């Protein structure tokens, strides 16, 4: 699943390429990709003729403001890529990808395509005078953004203190820190020297501080490299992310640790894989 760096990469690409573009027409190829409104006719009626404004990221969600030609607010377009979703800015004449679910035609031979192999991704068209949180209910449950001032040592300590769950599982909880996923949780735990099985309640103040800083640094580095592509992720122009080749531990089971040379190990925690160095994270 695309995580914060991948979604942020897409967000920046959308701001660069779609801002000010008019959605002249649209085509829904898979109606169940529409979370709201579920009616294809209603979705098309709401989206035709509006203009893309600014895109923002909230956790792993993308929110694009929509405006009318008069400048009046026209709502929001929300997207969650889930496991395999892609938003691609392409020439309209380009052959259609087999898993294309939605096409937004923007004139000048350009279109924004939503491509999704496993069909878990969702699209929302939020009407004006309605907040995105009202329609996209998952937004209400999100924790703080890791780049915000709210992500402080005090906040993190409050969320981890007394918790009986292991830290890897806690980092994947979107109600604690929004946007973290399997890849960057492993990377941050390695960088902070914390073993993934450590219970939240057993983390010392210094470890919590180091982990918080590591989360921010790892995410910043991944964004600089355009995210990670291990299977399906691509930026809006179809370019793969480059973080994977420099990962500390994720996807490197059996390979030598880049710091100490010990073989990277993997274990299952809560149904998810955790990659770690048994020496650096002892």
Swiss-Prot record:
Q: Which InterPro entries match?
A: DNA_glyclase/AP_lyase_DNA-bd (IPR015886), DNA_glyclase_Znf_dom_DNA_BS (IPR015887), Formamido-pyr_DNA_Glyclase (IPR020629), FPG_cat (IPR012319), MutM-like_N-ter (IPR035937), Ribosomal_uS13-like_H2TH (IPR010979), Znf_DNA_glyclase/AP_lyase (IPR000214), Znf_FPG/IleRS (IPR010663)
The record's annotation in SUPFAM superfamilies points to: Glucocorticoid receptor-like (DNA-binding domain), N-terminal domain of MutM-like DNA repair proteins, S13-like H2TH domain
Give the cofactor binding note.
Binds 1 zinc ion per subunit.
First and last residues of each zinc finger (FPG-type): 248-282
The record's section on Gene3D superfamilies has:
1.10.8.50, MutM-like, N-terminal
Give me the reactions it catalyses.
Answer: Hydrolysis of DNA containing ring-opened 7-methylguanine residues, releasing 2,6-diamino-4-hydroxy-5-(N-methyl)formamidopyrimidine; 2'-deoxyribonucleotide-(2'-deoxyribose 5'-phosphate)-2'-deoxyribonucleotide-DNA = a 3'-end 2'-deoxyribonucleotide-(2,3-dehydro-2,3-deoxyribose 5'-phosphate)-DNA + a 5'-end 5'-phospho-2'-deoxyribonucleoside-DNA + H(+)
Against CDD domains, the record matches this protein to:
EcFpg-like_N
**Where on this chain does DNA bind?**
99, 118, 163
Residue intervals passing through the bilayer: none
Q: Name the UniProt key words of this record, in alphabetical order.
A: DNA damage, DNA repair, DNA-binding, Glycosidase, Hydrolase, Lyase, Metal-binding, Multifunctional enzyme, Zinc, Zinc-finger
EC number(s): the record gives 3.2.2.23, 4.2.99.18
| Database matches in HAMAP family | Fapy_DNA_glycosyl (MF_00103)
Q: How does it assemble?
A: Monomer.
The record's NCBIfam families line, in alphabetical order, gives: fpg, PRK01103.1, PRK13945.1
Q: What is this protein called?
A: Formamidopyrimidine-DNA glycosylase
Which organism was this protein described from?
Rippkaea orientalis (strain PCC 8801 / RF-1) (Cyanothece sp. (strain PCC 8801))
Gene that specifies this protein: mutM
């Amino acid at each position: 699943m695309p995580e914060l760096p991948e979604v942020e990469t897409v967000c920046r690409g959308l701001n660069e390429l779609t801002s000010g573009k008019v959605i002249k027409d649209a085509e829904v190829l898979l109606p169940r990709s529409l979370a709201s409104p579920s009616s294809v006719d209603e979705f098309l009626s709401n989206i035709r003729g509006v203009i893309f404004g600014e895109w923002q990221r909230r956790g792993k969600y993308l929110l694009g403001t929509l405006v009318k030609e008069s400048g009046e607010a026209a709502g929001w377009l929300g997207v969650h890529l889930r496991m395999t979703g892609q938003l691609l800015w392409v020439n309209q004449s380009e052959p259609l990808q087999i898993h294309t679910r939605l096409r937004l035609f923007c004139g000048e031979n350009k279109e924004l395509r939503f491509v999704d192999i496993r069909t878990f991704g969702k699209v929302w068209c939020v009407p004006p005078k309605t907040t995105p949180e009202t329609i996209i209910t998952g937004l209400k449950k999100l924790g703080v953004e890791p780049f915000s001032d709210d992500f402080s040592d005090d906040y993190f300590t409050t969320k981890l203190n007394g918790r009986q769950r292991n830290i890897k599982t806690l980092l994947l909880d979107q109600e604690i820190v929004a946007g973290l996923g399997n890849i960057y949780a492993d990377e941050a735990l390695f960088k902070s020297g914390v073993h993934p099985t450590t219970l939240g309640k057993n983390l010392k103040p210094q470890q919590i501080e180091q982990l918080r800083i590591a989360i921010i640094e790892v995410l910043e580095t991944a964004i600089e490299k355009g995210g990670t592509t291990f299977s399906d992720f691509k930026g809006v122009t179809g370019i793969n992310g480059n973080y994977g080749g420099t990962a500390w531990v994720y996807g490197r089971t059996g390979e030598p640790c880049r710091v100490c040379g010990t073989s990277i190990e993997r274990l299952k925690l809560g149904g998810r894989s955790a990659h770690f160095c048994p020496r650096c994270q002892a």
